[in-house]
UniProtKB/Swiss-Prot annotation:
It is found in: Cytoplasm. It comes from Helicobacter pylori (strain P12). Residues 207-218 have a biased composition (Basic residues). CDD domains: IF2_eIF5B, IF2_mtIF2_II, mtIF2_IVc. Residues 175-188 have a biased composition (Low complexity). Gene3D superfamilies: P-loop containing nucleotide triphosphate hydrolases, Translation factors, Translation initiation factor IF- 2, domain 3. This is Translation initiation factor IF-2. Keywords: Cytoplasm, GTP-binding, Initiation factor, Nucleotide-binding, Protein biosynthesis. Its main location: cytoplasm. Residues 480-484 are annotated as: G2. NCBIfam families: IF-2, small_GTP.
Length: 947
């Protein structure tokens, strides 16, 4: 049977996918080949289809026929054998492919060559060309590719012979009208005539197409010339002869095909050999039948020689060069298998290049510079840096950090990865992903300066601002200290100045930092009688980081014995030289109590603002910064904001982090309602969905839908970030968790009146944690204490609910007693932090110290039945007391630690024995005492820990 080529295998060799199957089937129809998804083709059909797809050479072929049963094949072969007797030139492919190629099918428009019987006699003892062969396909079908003039003459001669055979066929048709085989042969003859005519036309049109490689010439016996006319009428004898011929040829070529099965798809260049037996490196294609006489089979292959056409040597050289080029390309893309239709192909090369690119995905090109958000997931970092995700995770693992692909990377991790992979990282603001594009075009107009007042606690910052505003805010603050960030507008010389008052307590460091980030000028208030303190230095660092000019206000100048020069000297040591000392920083003496120096301070601020030429765009959507957020009864969530650009009006939609809404009302620091908020102006706004985090950016948008969408995106991002932080753990943290499995935790829920105060309390409490006890913040929020807060800690031991500037309701108090949960409220942050510090100290174990008391050497041992071993000792140092702890040391190694159960001097029990005296010592539950051992006594001293 003929070896068939599966369509799927054909697609794979072409480098095409199943999605391109439809296109291949359509192209097959163009050359007369009907294919389906699971169809198979002969190598001939596959070769022609391949040439049509790759090179565009369209050769009409017989459509693919379904496999036939052997009986039908034999009948067709017999019919072919009858017709073959009248022809002298036969061309056929490998006999293994006869079964599907030799059968005529009248319904098809194109068929393989089956020549009609012609009673034409040849000269006796002559030489005839039995067949020609090419590199790949039969010569009849590839006739348009012949360029030799001798071949053109052969084709013309063949046309004349077929015309003569048609005349003989007409006579045969009249005498055998009922013979179905004759009808088929007549159809074949007509088709052969039309094919040869087409071939002659194609020969004239094509002159530079691949040549035939040679001719097969066979010497005939004389007897074969005498019976050509009678062979047609004697149909029974040829029938038997054809069957035998078919079987013999099939057996002969089956053996050859077994040896050449692997070489069918790898054609080699034909070599000139004297016999066909030695020509095993390539196949000689034959037609479906051969001219035999009766039962006589011509098998003398020694009379068969090969003649090569040397006129086409130039074309042959070109073919060899093309084959070498194709071979080099195949070697480069590592083609592992070849077949007759995978010899030359741009498509093949393109496909292999694609495969090679897919295989090299692990070796991605690393970018030299990339832009990375401040907080990015591991897989996002790999995508942006064009790195392999597994390599990134492996690198972090080797550095001691276990992460998943969805975990977030902090700034340190990004820098480490950049160094490991030799990348240049440009860190971008995370908020930019969620911001709506701002209107950057517009006329910039002058805006008021934003001034932040900072300094140490109790140095008079709020009192100074109260004097400027003629208000008394300091008296309304609990404990007389500022615990909220405040924003105010002050008019001086028909010019407005926005003041931001920040807390001076150490717990409010982030509030001071936020104030410095939105300010234009920083006023550092220092008490002249106290000098530079810790929070003063911190405030200066915030101002320096924000790159804003600093003005020093020397407060409390009304007090006696103040020394401003000492204060200036302390600031000069920090690098801030006064103007009168040749520096560039203004030091203004003021008194918040008497008001002295206030006008001078305001004028200095306005002069500095004029020098800075502060301007901003008033048109377009507003961009503001949330200074503080809280929940007010009857108003819901409110926020104090300061506008940086654009204009915020009542009714505008906005979003800030996870909060969104529409501005319902706006009130200034005097409590007056306003409609518009321009750059550098501050106001309290309502209409928020929730309390926004302090320091978040508020963006004005077109409508509520955009605001809600942006807030939801930000909420999803923050939620995933929180999950990532809960799953990330380093090796050090993991080992610490194992070592501290007895770690004592205090679960707390923190509720405060404002977002800034809540943030300060959380940070201060977390700083109290140590290796033994820790505060675990289960929940925190702005607003009153609710029953839900109680349920969060109802099952926890030592749980505490902390309230700052809020009071629980009656129902909440009753539920707290039911759940046995402690609620503690405070109005001053000092008291809250100190009480939590004491609570942690109570849970911590005391520090144990040892005090050496005495030492005794064993001189003798006495074993007393039912009592134990008593050691006779001499006290060499200190005092040995009964009941004290002792270590038994042998050769410098402690072998036992226990208490002295009995201490005797001679026969009397004693409480203690001093240095230089002898005594008897017996340990509690230990008798392995030897001469030469040493007793070392000590006592433990317990001391309280401090945080």
């Amino acid at each position: 049977m003929s070896e068939m080529v599966d369509l799927k295998e054909f697609l794979a060799e072409l480098g095409k996918t199943q999605k391109e199957l439809k296109n291949v089937i359509e192209q097959a129809k163009d050359i007369g080949l009907e294919l389906k998804t699971n169809s198979k083709m002969t190598p001939e059909q596959a070769g022609k289809l391949y040439k049509y797809i790759v090179d565009g050479i369209k050769e009409q072929i017989q459509a693919n026929q379904p496999a036939k049963n052997p009986e039908q094949d034999n009948k067709d072969d017999l019919n072919t054998a009858v017709a073959s007797k009248s022809l002298n030139k036969k061309v056929f492919k490998t006999p293994k492919k006869e079964e599907t190629k030799s059968q005529p099918k009248p319904k098809k428009t194109k068929e393989k060559k089956k020549e009609a019987p012609t009673p034409i006699a040849k000269k006796k003892g002559g030489i005839e060309i039995v067949n020609t062969f090419e590199d790949q396909t039969p010569p009849v079908e590839n006739a348009p590719k012949v360029v030799s003039h001798s071949q053109i003459e052969k084709a013309k001669q063949k046309l004349q012979e077929i015309q003569k055979s048609r005349e003989a066929l007409n006579k045969l048709t009249q005498s055998n009208a009922n013979n179905a085989n004759s009808t088929n042969n007549a159809n074949n003859a007509k088709k052969e005539i039309s094919e040869v005519k087409k071939q002659e036309q194609e020969i004239k049109r094509h002159e530079n197409i691949k040549r035939r490689t040679g001719f097969r010439v066979i010497k005939r016996n004389d007897e074969t010339e005498n019976e050509t006319e009678n062979s047609v009428t004697e149909s029974k004898k040829p029938t038997q002869s054809a069957a035998a011929i078919f079987e013999d040829i099939k057996k002969e070529w089956q053996e050859k095909d077994k040896q050449e099965a692997k070489k069918v798809k790898k054609p080699s260049k034909p070599k000139a050999t004297p016999t066909a037996k030695n020509n095993k490196s390539h196949k000689i294609d034959f037609s479906d039948a051969r001219d035999f006489k009766g039962n006589d089979i011509y098998d003398d292959e020694t009379d068969e020689i090969l003649l090569f056409d040397l006129h086409e040597q130039d074309n042959l050289n070109k073919e060899e060069e093309e084959k070498e080029i194709r071979q080099n390309i195949n070697d480069r893309v590592r083609v592992q298998r070849k077949n007759p239709w995978m010899n030359e192909s741009g498509i093949k090369r393109q496909s292999k290049k694609k495969r090679a690119f897919r295989n090299d995905n692990s070796q991605k090109v690393i970018q030299s510079a990339i832009a990375i958000p401040e907080e990015v997931r591991v897989y996002e970092f790999a995508q942006k840096a064009n790195l392999n995700l597994a390599d990134v995770i492996k690198t972090l693992f080797n550095l001691g950090l276990m992460v998943t692909k969805n975990d977030f990377l902090d700034k340190d991790s990004i820098e480490i990865l950049a160094e490991e992979f030799h990348l240049e990282i440009s860190v971008q603001n995370t908020l930019e992903e969620f911001e709506v594009e701002e209107v950057l075009e517009g006329v910039k107009k002058e805006r008021p300066p934003v001034v932040t007042i900072m300094g140490h606690v109790d140095h008079g910052k709020t009192s100074l601002l109260d004097k400027i505003r003629d208000k008394r805010v300091a008296h309304t603050e609990a404990g007389g200290i500022t615990q909220h960030i405040g924003a105010y507008m002050v008019e001086k010389n028909n010019k407005w100045v926005s003041f931001i008052d920040t807390p001076g307590h150490e717990a409010f460091s982030q509030m001071r930092n936020r104030g410095a980030q939105v300010t234009d000028i920083a006023v550092i208030v220092i008490a002249a009688d106290d000098g530079v303190k810790q929070q003063t230095i911190e405030a200066l660092e915030h101002a320096k980081a924000a790159n804003v000019p600093v003005i020093f206000a020397m407060n409390k100048m009304d007090k006696p014995n103040v020394n401003p020069d000492k204060l200036k000297a302390e600031c000069a040591e920090l690098g801030y030289n006064p103007v009168d000392w040749g520096g560039e920083h203004e030091f203004i003496p003021v008194s918040a109590k008497t008001g002295d120096g206030i006008d001078n301070l305001l004028e200095t601020i306005l002069i500095q603002a004029d020098i800075m030429e502060l301007k901003a765009i008033e048109e377009g959507s507003a961009r503001a910064v949330v200074l503080e957020g809280s929940v007010e009864k009857g108003r819901g969530a409110v926020a104090t904001v300061i506008v940086q650009s654009g204009t915020l009006s009542v009714g505008d939609s906005f979003f800030a982090e996870t909060a969104f809404g529409k501005v319902r009302t706006m009130t200034d620091d005097q409590g007056k309602s306003i409609q518009n908020l321009k750059p550098s102006m501050v106001a309290l706004i309502t209409g928020l969905s929730e309390v926004p985090p302090a320091g978040s950016v508020l963006i004005g948008v077109e409508n509520d839908s955009i605001a809600r969408l942006q807030a939801q995106k930000r909420a999803t991002y923050l939620h995933q970030k929180a999950l990532s932080k809960s799953t990330k753990v380093s090796f050090d943290e993991l080992s610490e968790m194992v070592a501290n499995k007895e770690l004592k935790n205090i679960p707390v829920v923190i509720k405060a009146d404002t977002q800034g105060s809540l943030e300060a309390i959380k940070n201060s409490l977390l700083e109290l944690n140590n290796e033994e006890v820790a505060i675990q913040v289960i929940h925190s929020g702005v607003g009153g204490i609710t029953e839900n807060d109680l349920s969060l800690v109802s099952n926890s031991e030592h749980a505490v609910i902390l309230g700052f500037n809020i009071r629980p309701t009656g129902n909440v108090k009753n539920k707290a007693k039911e759940y046995n949960v402690s609620i503690k409220t405070y109005t001053v942050i000092y008291a809250l932090i100190e009480e939590m510090r004491s609570l942690l100290l109570g849970l911590m174990s005391p520090i144990i110290e040892e005090e050496h008391t005495g030492q005794a050497e064993v001189r003798e041992t006495f074993n007393i039945p039912k009592v134990g071993t008593i050691a006779g000792c001499v006290v060499s140092d200190g005092v040995i007391a009964r009941g004290i702890k002792a270590r038994l040391i042998r050769d410098g190694v402690v072998i036992h630690t226990g208490e002295i159960l009995s201490l005797k001097r001679f026969k009397d029990d004693v409480k203690e024995v001093s240095k230089g005296y002898e005594c008897g010592i017996m340990l509690d539950n230990y008798n392995e005492i030897k001469v030469g051992d040493v007793f070392e006594t000590y006592k433990e001293i317990h001391k309280k820990r401090t945080l």
